[in-house]
């Protein structure tokens, strides 16, 4: 616990226009890596527009480590096919949380705390807003998959403070 900063809940919402890796569709799932941690979503059969709505929770010990996301096509009889990957950093999200704490309570629901634009330094496909949503600070993002012909993944990040951790 002494190295734990907090928990990051990644709500993997959906994939959009993912690559076809089987005859006419794919059976996608996502693997998320951060440091030595590895988490994965469930497989959604026969879809290039899967709705996962899976929550994956990472223990954050170093907020400077990138979070890597890889989409795979599940295959029963052979190795799973890679369908693209993306990477993001939680530094801007943590900065926004610190800023919101400095502002104190009383911010109205829906307040945009920070806006992050797509750039060559990130995998965002559109502006990403960090907002106050029902008392929680969340970041919504669409990530454009790299090393593949098409596809995006929609995520929502939520920070969870853990009593006894270093905190942010």
Curated annotation (Swiss-Prot):
GO annotations of cellular component type: nucleus; plasma membrane
Domain of life of the organism encoding this protein: Eukaryota
Function: Stimulates the GTPase/ATPase activities of Obg-like ATPases. Mediates the transient calcium-dependent interaction of PYR/PYL/RCAR abscisic acid (ABA) receptors with the plasma membrane and thus regulates ABA sensitivity. Binds liposomes in the absence of exogenous Ca(2+), but this activity is enhanced in the presence of Ca(2+) and generates membrane curvature.
Protein name: Protein C2-DOMAIN ABA-RELATED 1
Tissue: Expressed in roots.
Species for this entry: Arabidopsis thaliana
Cofactor(s), names only, from the UniProt record: Ca(2+)
C2 domain mapped to chain residues: 1-104
This protein's encoding gene: CAR1
Keyword Lipid metabolism attributed: no
